[in-house]
């Protein structure tokens, strides 16, 4: 083993979406950070679908953005197709999705990494961890080079013990074209972590020049184009292109059913559990046998490549079956497959072995983030990487760790779900996982988190000044609207009654009127006496939403305040649950497995009853551990 002379504060292993966010935020907070990757050219690579956001996922992206992260900005700089999902539904469940040019996206990530002070890149795979005095102290690369740091973040994606399946052909790999991390996987299996296998997959890629687009339904970008980042201005967007929609048919399904003998999933070769919410096409055909078609979205991979991503047909069937079923789909009868679809199995570690900071419970200074914790998706990985990077930097600064609570961010929901409940299948974020959806909207992530990000040191001056100006503009306009009185039978009242068919029987403020569902801010401001309107769309949106949902938001905040005291009550890590009178053996076992840090976390462990929480509370009070 050769030692290097450089000493770092934080070492990040892996350069995917978790690793890049972890490295960037640690360096932004002033930590000397080393990012190790087996190939610098693949930093920030979109290994599967070239898209960012979606239902539940764009909430994570915007929270990352609010805390100074790079993902949303890169999506805006590389986005070639943008849509607002659930646009006709309430603001709590609206989402933004950006189809990205994968080359432009990777270039945006590269540029951020290469221009970040306090961050160094080095191309080497990692084979071993250095543990000194029972805590992380560094890593050893494949050529025996030792790098030292008191904190190490593993963001290794699907590379740990990775095994690729195409039909009955199987070979070791971290993803197509990349080697697996076998030595590191073996090293981690020697440590006291609970380890299992998961599986994910990807569809074949298609040459767009061989697609018959005249047979397909075109889906253009929304206009005006939605922005992913709060700090984007929209001037430098790439050229926008359309996606296209087609669907499978009975012939497709027959080909797949007849080809199941070539499926490693259905022949028992694959042991890992696949993603429930992104199943392979063969899994869909078997599970939903009554369906005679499934929708496909044909999504361009970039502006300067003919390759197309057929979203909806992830598969590990043999290549000849892939070719046959693709050719049975309308518009794809003569298409050329450029890359086969495949499944990949990999190691993941039970996230209940992590603290909410994402530091491992058994090895201080060692953090896990991304698919190693059982999640699926770029956005979920990036969110974990950000929190791991923040907490590694805070540890170096000898400051307390920080993770947002469930009532503060979807990131908090994600990490609490993982560290409290664990997962036995790839975990994906949905808005339905959050109890306080109306508070945790994608439109207000900056208002929820940017001040905290500034306190932590991960939001730079430019973003902070932009945020302060926006917040002041919102507050100033709200005060103006509250002071504007509209009297019955006045000229303004008559204009409002005529425009909105709303009878004004008493005096109202302009803010009162915005609480009515029939009236919105831009339309109200078209009445000359009530203007001028604020022109910034994001400010106008906040004024509208905050006015209309004020009552609901006040109720949710009051509910959170009522629960806060007991939810945040600390449980000492040394607590012996055998000494808590009245707990069943099952409850004791679950508490010992998870080792919750607060009563709130304990209450969310599956199988822990309200009665058990009451017994815990009595015990803590008896031991004078609860005020």
Curated annotation (Swiss-Prot):
Predominant subcellular localization, coarse grouping: cytoplasm
Cofactor list: FAD
SMART domains attached to this UniProt entry: GIDA_assoc_3 (SM01228)
Keywords assigned by UniProt, alphabetized: Cytoplasm, FAD, Flavoprotein, NAD, tRNA processing
A single MF term (Gene Ontology): flavin adenine dinucleotide binding
Cellular compartments annotated: Cytoplasm
Keyword set includes Mitochondrion: no
Quaternary state and interactors: Homodimer. Heterotetramer of two MnmE and two MnmG subunits.
Function: NAD-binding protein involved in the addition of a carboxymethylaminomethyl (cmnm) group at the wobble position (U34) of certain tRNAs, forming tRNA-cmnm(5)s(2)U34.
HAMAP family per UniProt: MnmG_GidA (MF_00129)
Name of the protein in question: tRNA uridine 5-carboxymethylaminomethyl modification enzyme MnmG
